[in-house]
């Protein structure tokens, strides 16, 4: 028996980090007997973002059950100096040659570090972009002047040991990540929060004092990597992910939708659902194969 999947995220965070790489796009082909790709029917709207489960960008070997979307970035204030980034990984975080303005603190370049549970990390300078999501032309929702991390940037200062901890592997290429960037859905409005406001050696934010000499820096929550959804003018109180049923034999790919807002439009009414509130760390307990996780 198969079931379609619909996930509601109430007040969840979306922190955007992008791999700064020039990479060709596309995926592998399938044979003529490949089963059709399941899809869900979602009413169109400016708050609807297309999702795809399937092959990732060329050069990537990590293509199993990854959820991809596209993001449009523009130089702040411009509607023409823009670039669409395909094969961006949607997670519960290649900009080509778009000249985004880098963020400096007291004339020193600001850097950001993010570590993942699989003992990998992303490191790069912080830049500012207008981020567009939703709508058929990725022009439905706008997060203006959003700070993002540009991982894999040529010429960037080397990550400090607090970021590149022993045993951690850097993500600097499409082949490392299996995507051109990350659009992460997490439990917080910022990537670090209150700790980074008052703690200098917070592990997240650093400034280059010259010649690659890095030092930790405290950053206010308003100046951290913020979630794009809360910066939207409307449809900014949560997200909904809708994916189709997939037969037990599997499918080569599937398409779904990321819908912005909860109960703000006809296409995002939650109906009767079970609400599961996360703990302060963003986790909740579940049971799998007789084990509580």
Write out the residue ranges for each language-model feature.
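Bacterial N-terminal signal peptides that target proteins for export
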Residues: 2-15
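Bacterial Sec-dependent N-terminal signal peptides
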Residues: 18-46
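Residue-level signal for helical boundary/lining positions with a hydrophobic bias
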Residues: 20, 87-89, 180
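Aspartyl protease catalytic domain
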Residues: 37-65, 144-150, 157-293
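Signature of the N-terminal lobe/flap region of pepsin-like aspartyl proteases
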Residues: 63, 74, 79-85, 90-162
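A short acidic-Thr-Gly-centered motif at the start of a beta-strand
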Residues: 68-83, 283-293
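Short acidic-hydrophobic surface loop/beta-edge motif
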Residues: 71, 127-131, 241, 286
